[in-house]
Amino acid sequence: MSSSPSEMTSTLLALSNNLADAVERVASAVVAVNARQRIPSSGVHWQSGVIVTADETIKRSEDITVTLNDGRTVPATLAGRDPSTDIAVLKLSDVELPVAQIGEATSLKVGHLVLAVGRSDESGLNASMGAVSALGGSWRSSYGGLIDQFVRIDLTLYPSLEGGPLVDAMGRVVGITVSGPRRTVLAIPATTVNRVVAQLLEKGRIARGYIGLGMQPVHLPDSLKSTLTLNSNGGVIVVNVEPNGPGDRAGVLIGDVLLSLDGTPVSDTGDVQAMLGPECVGTPVSVQVMRGGALTEVEILVGERPRRGE
């Protein structure tokens, strides 16, 4: 039996009110972040005195301000940033502000309605509704950052919403909304944010591994794969070796083709970067190398990627 028009109206009104209530629950903890030209981004009061936002929206390290729910604009200091997970942490001093209720992205299901919430200096609170379009397991970004869960959202991400909270139907913050590749919208899950925030507050940075090599993808001809009995179609060819860097000290040469790291095949530079997470710094990695048409093994002691400006 089909629903009557009045029943459908009542259902839609109830859904609309519930979503508005979800926005209202987080609204007082959402701030506008002024750290780039023209359009501000958003952030959320994650814990006492700590604002979390997207690193990609932080275009300067000084003269940062945030606009609160009551309209006040106050200074904020950059406590730390991690481009690999797209998380930046700002600190506030002597500011009373409600803390958002933090949930878990693991509670989400494909098809669940979610809301990207933000704040701008001009229009105040704003939101965009969408649905969870894809979920997955843990993954590494192209810069080596470990993300605990893959969460893709189908919604319109206006510039003022970037870096703001993604909330579920209960108004709980389940992640930070960021721009993904090819105009996708992703959420950095709350578990990842908690881990990154704790490390940034303690150390101001997160170590990332590097091997001091400039590389680019290369395709291997079938004849060579057959001769060397290789399963992979390609690897990464070394086009630059940083003097006295980890690769140089291990004896890697320009023209070497890296085929695998610790037994895991690599086919592009993103594969290599993704395997050099914080846990790799200071540890050796076994690299299968093709040199002069022959295979050899090289052990590289992974170094720490220099910070920006170093």
Predicted regions and their residues:
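Short, conserved beta-turn/loop elements at beta-strand boundaries and strand-helix junctions
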Residues: R38, S48, K59, R81-T85, ...
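Short, small/polar residue-rich loop motifs at catalytic or cofactor-binding pockets
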Residues: Q37-P40, R60-S61, Y158-E162, G235, ...
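Catalytic-histidine neighborhood of serine endopeptidases
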Residues: M1-S2, R36-P40, W46-I87, L92-V95
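Active-site-proximal beta-strands of protease catalytic cores
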Residues: V30-N34, I51-D55, L108-S120, I153-T156, ...
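C-terminal recognition in membrane/secretory proteostasis and scaffolding
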Residues: M1-S3, M8-T11, D21, Q47, ...
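A conserved glycine-rich beta-strand in the N-terminal activation segment of trypsin-fold
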Residues: T11-A22, A29-S48, A54, R72-P75, ...
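Beta-strand/loop subdomains of soluble extracytoplasmic proteins
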Residues: R60-L78, V95, K109-A116, L125-R140, ...
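Active-site region of chymotrypsin-like
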Residues: A27-A29, S93-Q101, N126-R182, A190-R195, ...
